[in-house]
């Protein structure tokens, strides 16, 4: 089971965590930026996740990453949490740690980022929005929004290649994960995992089973 740390802001709001109004929330104070500027909130999540790791196989995924420095800061906090748990005699297991690739910065730097983590999950919704400079919430721009844009597909291929070159497995989530027009393409690219909602499990699975690339 892969568990993502706090990922609110922009189109993801939570009643229990109020954020101030921002003119451009999609590029504002959200996701890992909240966790790194409010480390006690982050530590609370990490403590719970590592406690849970003693009872089952989990992995932790960090959203909205843009730099190696962020990952290294995350690792410092993770080590602090693990040290505190050891001192308290709390049992936990080592877990895989990965990141969301949902910004052009992360995609371009994916060869370097892959040296720091165990896996990538390509968040195609935000990656498309940021790459094409199109607000997904703006209906006036619907005709310009093209998730199949060659730039997006090239970026996905780059991330897959860079991840695999450093031993990271790579998955795809977001709307494109369930886009059956691209399932065959993703298999040819070498994708390791497609994350889809329950509604799309059967049609995507059928395509994978019948694909010549499924091996």
Each language-model region and where it sits:
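Conserved alpha/beta-domain cores
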Residues: 1-215
